[in-house]
Amino acid sequence: MTVLVCNDTPPAIRGMLKRWFVEPKPNVLVGTVNHRTREKTLEYIRRNAPNLGMLVLATEKNSQGFSVQQFG
């Protein structure tokens, strides 16, 4: 599972994210995507919306069972 918490998401990026994620609250997106899709999506966002603030919580195969990344 992946959770994205974003600030001021541009409409084009928000629409793209809704392909794979549901948005229970504005700018909070939750979905189950594989590692490759998640990394490609984050790369696309960083390239096309470099000023977007984003917190990413994702399940991982580590001792905690999840990872936390922050951008912007």
Predicted regions and their residues:
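Basic nucleic-acid-binding interfaces
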Residues: 2-22, 26-72
